[in-house]
Amino acid sequence: MIYVDNRQNKVEASEKLIERLTEVIEFALKEEEVNMKCEISLLFVDNNEIKEINNETRGINRETDVLSFPMLEYEDKKVFKDMYKDYKFSQSDFDGDELVLGDIVLSLEKALEQSKEFNHSYEREASYLVVHSVLHLLGYDHMEDDDKIIMRSREEDILNKLNIIRG
């Protein structure tokens, strides 16, 4: 289940956008071989709120586009399908019958700004940021160059399969 909470009023969070981002999340989970019911919270905020959250949680006092808060722990260079595909989780990892994967905090204001900067649609930018964040929830990272190459490849593969293209 994808729980959406819109806590901003600077950029419209239309039903169409919410449906598309929900579809993107569900497809990314399927592509990453997550074979169980999952819970992800998707929180829409503005630039001021994401700056506050970024400062509180990461000690970085500036706005960003998206933040990811995974609930599962991953070994270095391991992702969900490597560690948890056939794992027997404890009941504390679940909310009811759904595995809690974590939270995505997305600045719709920043997504709109970046869509203009990169000259593609708002839907494409928001979708990219959500895929990026889902991959973080599943253990992907981009701090090292080799990890970044893998993560970017997965992002583009998922978006291309959904026909969400640049431009």
From Swiss-Prot:
This protein's record includes keyword rRNA processing? yes
**Cofactor binding comment, as recorded:** Binds 1 zinc ion.
Q: Which InterPro entries match?
A: MetalPrtase_cat_dom_sf_prd, YbeY, YbeY_CS
Cite the EC number: 3.1.-.-
Q: Which GO terms describe its cellular component?
A: cytoplasm
Residues spanning the membrane:
none
- Keyword terms of this UniProt record: Cytoplasm, Endonuclease, Hydrolase, Metal-binding, Nuclease, Ribosome biogenesis, rRNA processing, Zinc
Biological-process GO terms, alphabetical: rRNA processing
Annotated PROSITE patterns: UPF0054
Localisation per UniProt entry: Cytoplasm
The main place the protein resides is: cytoplasm
Name its co-factor(s). Answer: Zn(2+)
Coiled-coil-forming residues are none
Which EC class is the enzyme in?
A: hydrolase
So which domain of life are we looking at? Bacteria
MF terms from GO for this chain are:
metalloendopeptidase activity; RNA endonuclease activity; zinc ion binding
Q: Which residues bind Zn(2+)?
A: H132, H136, H142
Gene3D superfamilies the record matches: Metalloproteases ('zincins'), catalytic domain (3.40.390.30)
Q: Which family does it belong to?
A: Belongs to the endoribonuclease YbeY family.
Function summary: Single strand-specific metallo-endoribonuclease involved in late-stage 70S ribosome quality control and in maturation of the 3' terminus of the 16S rRNA.
What name does the UniProt record give this protein? Endoribonuclease YbeY
- Name the source organism: Clostridium beijerinckii (strain ATCC 51743 / NCIMB 8052)
Task: Give the lineage.
Answer: Bacteria, Bacillati, Bacillota, Clostridia, Eubacteriales
What gene is it encoded by? ybeY
